[in-house]
């Protein structure tokens, strides 16, 4: 049976525009020491296209849900902003970024190089309690690099097979990780790190016109379960987030799960939406939503067609028709 033709999100573009391919993350400078679930390395080229349009350039970039921090680090290393504010509420991830800001990046780099990694040595190390901040940061990196998918949330465990049967050594690259931490020393004095609620920090900076936000919240809207599985702190008031974004005097760029509830909130707050392709951890091509005040700079991108998707909501499964174009705030 022939599949029905899907509508373009950008109907004004020509019909024969090639379907865009997901970004090959190997082509993007790897700045973050984390192998982070839901990381945004693949989004870096799009982020560059957005932020380079500003003249004068923004003073500060705020990442209220920093996680692996690749967007903030890109903004610093490539001189898109003078400073960044990185916000993360998870205490283990926070330990890493706070250690970097406090001047312990080189200590962590050397600790990584000297560590003899076996399953037993990792268990011994991460079982230690009453450790100081930099030791906690090292424990976090160990877990992130040896646990399945880099997931730190409760219930995660060691890689069993990994790449080519290497098990927990599959993602442990001491020289590479050490160099990434050493490089972080170059920008550490331009990072303000806050272990805090991202929504509170958005509100704090909302009146500043020289500030831009990159917002990548945990995906739990509409009963989505990925955020609950991947992150320790997954509870989020999504409606409040959209309300805060509407109040910011500067600008923001948000990435979100392609869910009907999210699109409804974006329309209700008058935001524009676009879809962008990405490859998930299972190497399947998916689409994520890009949300902002003005996404006209994305109009030169190739058209992205929205698939007919089945969304799982709390209590029941239902098919959500997605044939409508996601235009500039169209209802």
Task: Set out the residue ranges of the language-model regions.
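Short hydrophobic/aromatic-enriched beta-strand-loop microsegments
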Residues: 83-88, 109, 214, 270-278
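Short, surface-exposed loop/helix-turn segments at secondary-structure junctions
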Residues: 227-233
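Short active-site oxyanion
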Residues: 58-61, 81-83, 188-192, 246-252
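Conserved S-adenosyl-L-methionine
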Residues: 56-117
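Long, positively charged, glycine-interspersed low-complexity recognition regions
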Residues: 3-11, 233-331
